[in-house]
Structures are given as C-alpha cells and as structure tokens.
Amino acid sequence: MTKYVGIRGHRGSGKISIAYLIANTIEYLMDFKNVGEDFDNLYKSWCNELMKDEQNAVYNIDTPHVYLESFGDLPKMLTEMLTNIPHEYIYSDYYKDHVFINIRTMEYIEMDDNEISNFDHDLWKSQDLIEFVEEYGFGEFDSYWISLREFILYYAKTTSKYLGNDIWVKLMRVSEERDNAMQERYNIFGKGDKYKLFVDLKAVSEVTYVKERNGFIIKINRPRNIKEKGFDNLENDTRYDYELNIEGSLYD
C-alpha cells in the first residue's frame, strides 16, 4: 500500500530538511518498532547521529520505503532537455542563482556575485519576461538573460498558461501510473507499506493530488524565510493536517 505525504512552505522554510528527517524516521520506525521501552532513548541517539551528516541531510532522502517526489522536478527536466545544463546544476540552489541563460540562443554562463553586479545586460525576472514577450515579442533584443532559477519558472509558467495550471499534476499522474505498473510487474518494493513524500507543494492542484490519495499535508512556517509565489496561491488553502513553526536549523 502506498501512503502519501505532502510538504508545503515558502522557499527557505526547511522543506528538504524536514523531508529528510521524516523519511529516515519512517525507516527507523519500521526497523525498530518492536524495541519496547528503550525506543525513546534509541531514537534520540539515532537522531543525534543522523544530524551529524550535513551532506546527507540535503541530498539523501530516498530510502528503502520512502520515495521523494516533487512536481517541480517536471519543469526542471524540461529545462535540462532545452539547455543541456548539467543535471547537478539544476538541483543546486547555488547554481540556480549563479548560472544565467540567454533565452534566444540557450547558451549559459556561470558568474560570481561580483560578475553578476557588473554584467552588461539586463537580468530578467520570469514574470517580467513573460509580460514583455506577450506585448512585444522576442524581436527587440538579441539576448534575454535570465537566471537558471527564473528560467525554470519561466518555462513552468509558460507551459501552465497554454496547457493548463494542472499540467504538471497530469504529467505526475501519468508518470506514477507507469511507475506503479513497473513496480507491480517486477515486485520492486516487495511487500509492505511504502511512502511517497511530495516536497514543495506550490499549487492548489498539487495539494488536491495528495489529498485525493488520502495523504496528509504538513505546512511549514519559518519567520524571515524568503517568500515566493507558486502557480496558484496557497495562502488561502487551509487543507493541511499538521503545521510546524520552525526556528533555527535542522541540527537545533
């Protein structure tokens, strides 16, 4: 049986860190659920060891029973296909803010903060570029430079505009049905429960996808985090089962 969990929160709120902790906690509970009265002390000791590995706390989320999913991976895959930018760049916060793409030619360059400040061309935001192109087209300039982060948003928003805001949900559904068929055919997961952990829910349709599968939603609040607007506004969507108010870091 597949169980669904969704995490929502603004950029910088700690969604990936929480996902990592949830995934590994589920594994721990499944491995040590019969340890009896020593469970609390064993769990605390395990958490202390887990938090020591900073690299894993960011990148190692998939575990034997928990699989990470993200609707945001689909436009990232499109970006990788269009630009030939290395896969690891597209999933790195540093490179997303320091790699810039000329939309006219699809060439890309990496710049440090000083080079960004002294760059000879305007650097566009995704929404500004969408509105400009709608009104004037691409004909006015030879180059339109945009950060990798904004490039991903640009194509995600443009695709959603013409194919519908739920296009990424539809693609996820097709992908999941295909994966489930393969897993059943080859018994990839074996018997027992498995979990799909959806990180970074941004759209109403994405929350609906998890809830329709009897999943639960975790909303993360973190003071002073960087706010970002998704394809749909989740501020008025009250469909969450748990709310976490976070201060400090994962290690706190």
Where is each model-derived feature located?
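Hydrophobic packing residues within well-ordered alpha-helices of enzyme cores
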Residues: 22, 79, 172, 207-210
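Small-molecule kinase domains that catalyze NTP-dependent phosphoryl transfer to phosphate-bearing small molecules
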Residues: 6-11, 20, 36, 42-43, ...
